[in-house]
Swiss-Prot record:
Pathway: Pyrimidine metabolism; dUMP biosynthesis; dUMP from dCTP (dUTP route): step 2/2. CDD domains: trimeric_dUTPase (cd07557). This is Deoxyuridine 5'-triphosphate nucleotidohydrolase. It holds the Pfam family dUTPase. GO terms for molecular function: dUTP diphosphatase activity; magnesium ion binding. Substrate binds at residues 70-72, 83, 87-89, 97. The keyword Ribonucleoprotein does not apply.
């Protein structure tokens, strides 16, 4: 398991609410919680930025983190991430914030301490552009959206 530096920014984290943890041995994501001052009602179409009370420092440029939605919130309640995926670069050290968007038709209450997203570490490969006049041919070529076939 990889060590990840973290700072607790809200004293309720680790006392009133557990630190982010994997739910099962096979879980890929650490659950992030809404460290709000009070329950927040998210109206249909509304987006709100939710603090997690936590900052991390990955440090290794070969890694990044992504903040992803929790599947149940999106499927059952229409609550998804306002930016769809949050990318945390290895050199970022600020608080992890979660943009929550209510794409549903009814108001939804985000409770203080509720699990609202998950954090997943991913490998990163940095590249540089090699400018060429032409590409080696491939079977697909420049075929775009829908080019590889339907269902």
């Amino acid at each position: 398991m990889h060590a990840l530096q973290a700072k607790i920014l809200d004293p309720r984290l680790g006392s009133e609410f557990p630190l982010p943890a994997y739910a099962t041995p096979g879980s890929a994501g650490l659950d992030l919680r809404a460290l709000l001052k009070e329950d927040t009602i998210l109206e249909p179409g509304q987006t709100v930025l939710i603090p997690t009370g936590l900052s991390i420092y990955i440090g290794d440029p070969g890694l990044a983190a992504v903040i992803l939605p929790r599947s149940g919130l999106g499927h059952k309640h229409g609550i998804v991430l306002g930016n769809l995926v949050g990318l945390i670069d290895s050199d970022y050290q600020g608080e992890l914030m979660v943009s929550c968007w209510n794409r549903g038709n009814t108001p939804f209450t985000i409770a203080v301490g509720e699990r609202i997203a998950q954090l997943v570490l991913v490998p990163v490969v940095q590249a540089h552009f090699e400018i060429v006049e032409a590409f080696d041919e491939s079977q697909r070529g420049a075929g775009g959206f829908g080019h590889s076939g339907s269902h």
